[in-house]
């Protein structure tokens, strides 16, 4: 999944400081998402990782708020409904884990992703929540679960 993240983020100009590509957990997702109230899901086709997404407690946020994190897909997996299915799976997992709100950060230019989030019921926020360290992101959304 680290390779997917490192392939996709530069496509959108998101490779510098303040972006998730630089998070230490990128190389250790299985460790980061084995924590309580966290989960990560991976899309694999013919043995190749094509994308994934996870949820975890929002750093610096209320305990009933999770963050949708590291949702990225290689180009060949986009436009087929995979993102919609995986997003729904993450939302259902967040509910099962007892969260009441799901937050996410993205950026200008990730228009398809923002459309997907809006279609799923996420609402735009005026500013960031928590302390994710992703100061380069400029779009914020939340979904009441």
Annotate each language-model stretch with its function.
Residues 2-76, 87-89, 93, 126-130, ...:
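Acetyl-CoA-dependent GNAT
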